[in-house]
């Protein structure tokens, strides 16, 4: 297993880092925690067709600000996104005009799942 910190900053990007995004590369999966602006580096680390799972911890801006970059990615596999209740609605607002193209136009297919407490 390899852990890569793509972003570790708090509220905003700086010369030395981006907002939160962590990649865990395991034998069977890629697991991504949060979608801060560090997410734009993700495709540099995805070099196989292992499933990709993205977990959104919460909807503060610095944890989802990188979602607009999904239009850059050309992953062959589905990108599975997990988040709390309301994730679909948030994604439909953030992954849309005027920020980026709508979800339906993304080159990578998304599968969105909402998790409940408990």
Predicted feature residues:
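Binuclear metal-dependent hydrolase catalytic cores
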Residues: 1-118
């Amino acid at each position: 297993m390899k852990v890569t910190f793509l972003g570790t900053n708090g509220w905003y990007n700086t010369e030395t880092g981006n907002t939160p995004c962590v990649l865990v590369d395991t034998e069977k999966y890629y697991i991504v925690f949060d979608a801060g602006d560090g997410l734009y580096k993700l495709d540099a680390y995805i070099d196989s067709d292992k499933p990709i799972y993205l977990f959104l911890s919460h909807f503060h801006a610095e944890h989802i600000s990188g979602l607009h970059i999904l239009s850059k990615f050309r992953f062959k596999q589905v990108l599975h996104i997990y988040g709390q209740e309301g994730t679909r609605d948030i994604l439909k607002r953030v992954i849309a005009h005027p920020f980026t193209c709508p979800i339906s136009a993304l080159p990578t297919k998304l599968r969105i799942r909402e998790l409940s407490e408990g």
